[in-house]
Amino acid sequence: MAKKVVDQFKLQIPAGKANPSPPVGPALGQRGVNIMEFCKAFNEKTKDMMGFNIPVVITVYSDRSFTFVTKQPPATDLIKKAAGIQKGSDNPLKNKVGKITQAQLEEIAKTKMPDLNTTDLEAAKRIIAGSCRSMGVEIVD
């Protein structure tokens, strides 16, 4: 018999840096999950993605056990790293804050493919290019 799902929720946690402080501790504690067990498992799974915030979907079962699925880092984090900037433009139509190449765009699209609602690389590149435009990042050849 399958375990009954009690709750499912999403968090964004820095890779390899999950600890019992907010937002992780309160989110797990109020659902009765062993916080340290989650932190150890998450940190072990994400230690190779350091420097990114990792979206994670946590499913809690009736016996207080849990499973979690990590997603790819947000497209904006990948774009900021590729462009070498700290944050996007406050006015992306007028102020361009960085540039990325077509090759970098394709690499980001390939990385994000499992999380995007497309299986076509060209469509994924267009989605990422839209994120670039809204951040004030130019795409150059």
Curated annotation (Swiss-Prot):
**Post-translational modification (record):** One or more lysine residues are methylated.
Give the PROSITE patterns listed for this entry.
RIBOSOMAL_L11
One Gene Ontology CC term in the entry? cytosolic large ribosomal subunit
GO molecular function annotations of the record = large ribosomal subunit rRNA binding; structural constituent of ribosome
**Keyword vocabulary terms for this entry:** Methylation, Ribonucleoprotein, Ribosomal protein, RNA-binding, rRNA-binding
Name the coiled-coil region(s). none
Q: Which InterPro entries match?
A: Ribosomal_uL11, Ribosomal_uL11_bac-typ, Ribosomal_uL11_C, Ribosomal_uL11_C_sf, Ribosomal_uL11_CS, Ribosomal_uL11_N, Ribosomal_uL11_N_sf
User: Which GO BP terms, alphabetically?
Assistant: translation
Q: Which SMART domains match?
A: RL11
Q: Which domain of life is it from?
A: Bacteria
Q: Which family does it belong to?
A: Belongs to the universal ribosomal protein uL11 family.
- Tell me, in a sentence or two, what this protein's role is: Forms part of the ribosomal stalk which helps the ribosome interact with GTP-bound translation factors.
Q: How does it assemble?
A: Part of the ribosomal stalk of the 50S ribosomal subunit. Interacts with L10 and the large rRNA to form the base of the stalk. L10 forms an elongated spine to which L12 dimers bind in a sequential fashion forming a multimeric L10(L12)X complex.
Protein known as: Large ribosomal subunit protein uL11
Please tell me the species this chain comes from: Nitratiruptor sp. (strain SB155-2)
